[in-house]
Structures are given as structure tokens and as C-alpha cells.
């Protein structure tokens, strides 16, 4: 294989659910002078990027092909590690866990066990948020642990015209768009909105990107409630997708600060969403300026993949 090839391994995921990772990592690879390929295989003669989600068969294959702290393996860490578990949502002890992020479920117990079984084989670990970075660094692994700073990957040419054509000059069917796993905490917010006669469109979290794009254009704002009331970390990939695709959004404020906070529109309680829904257009001027400020601040950042060359 070409000496500057880099393999984006997707065999451990539903491809539709990681479209943003595939797109952004491909651009990062190109910007680092690499040629990305996307496969369901791991290769010994090139570098491989694996997005976290391990199982026994994948771990067995990695151990067969590679050695510990292997420079050919880079892991994209997508979850906070806490008390020996992958636990990004950090529900409070008094909260009922349900939906996708139930840390007591067999799925997360197995996924966490497989993570710790294989993490030492990676020479580089790329963390998609500050809180993930801090939690991985605390494990004192021999891998090179690096933070992936958010970037704008789009085109600044005709930025304002393109933003308006997507969000203002389009027919709106609903005020808010929501996609993601449902918990009692999230459901209580959605039910309050519906009771106030706010229109809400909900889609599956693994909907194809073309559907997500189309529905984002026909709704007023993408909605980002926390999983649980104690969830500490902003859903940064949701924010990054919206900023790069130039769609307005509103996120529930989390306690942990991030480098995206200055580019976000936040809410603290559902009553604020009801007020916003009365006239979605009033938040558009702030949304477009936030989006443009993000693009200007991050457009020329170096590729996160340069350290693994």
C-alpha cells in the first residue's frame, strides 16, 4: 500500500452513525498529507485509525496483527472514562438510567471491558473533547494522548449567502429538530415543549446524513438537551456537525467548559426554549455570527493527525 495511506477502520460501527467522523477524519488526513481509505480491515503495512467501540473479535484481531503501543494504531476516544467505565453522560445516583447511555446495561459493561482490554495496543489516542482528554490522561498510558481541537472544514467563500440560503430561505415544517437517545430527563423537556404547542421533529440518531441535512434545513433549530441533569460534557460532535454544515442550534448548558462555548447558543431551562420558539428568527443573527466566528477562528488550525506521521 502507498506509504502515505491511512486506513479509517469502520468495521466496528454502523457507518451511518459515524458519517461525521469519517468526513472530518478524511479531511484531517488530507491536510496532513495523507491519503485516507475507508475499510472494514486492519492493515499491518499502514497506519490505522479506529473509532472507539471494541468487541472480543476485534480485540482478538488487533492482538494478532499488532503489538502493544503500536505506532500503526491510533484510537479516537469518544467517551469519558470514569471509575473503570466508559461514562460520558455521568447520570446522578438518583436518576433512572435508560436509552442508549445506560451505564449499567450489559452493552456498556462489555464495551468498557473490551476498551480496557485493548487500549494498551494503541500508540496514539485522539480525544474528541476536553473531558475525555483529562480522563484518558489520568490512566497514565504509554500512548501519546492528544486532544482534537474543533475545526471548520468548509468554505468561507459566500459564507453569509450560503448560511441564509440554508436556514432563512427555506420552508420550515417544525421549530425544533431533535435526534438522539431518549432518557426520562430528555423526554420531560420534549413533552413540556409539545404541551406548550411547540412543534418538534424527532429522528433516529443513526439517520443517514442526507436525511439529517434535509431535516436541518426544514426546521428552525437543532436541539441539544443533556442526557441527564448531571451530565457534565457538551455533545461536541453534535455542535461540530452543526457548525460545519452551517445550521443553527441551541444546546443545554453543561458545567464543564469547552472551546466551543463561545460559538454556542445555550439554554438553561425548557421555558427558554418555549420563548425562543415564539420567533425562531430572533436568534438567527447571533447564530450566524457565532458560526462565522468559529469558521474564522479555526479554519487554519493544523491537522490533528500530524503527530502520527
Spell out what each predicted region is:
Residues 271, 281-309:
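A charged, aromatic-enriched C-terminal amphipathic alpha-helix characteristic of glycosyltransferases
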Residues 2-46, 52-71, 75-265, 297:
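Nucleotide-sugar donor-binding catalytic core of glycosyltransferases
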Residues 262-271, 278-282:
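Conserved acidic donor-binding segment of nucleotide-sugar-dependent glycosyltransferases
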Residues 63-65, 277-280:
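Short amphipathic alpha-helix with an adjacent loop that forms part of the alpha/beta core around
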Residues 236-239, 270, 274:
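Short amphipathic alpha-helical surface patches that serve as generic macromolecular interface elements
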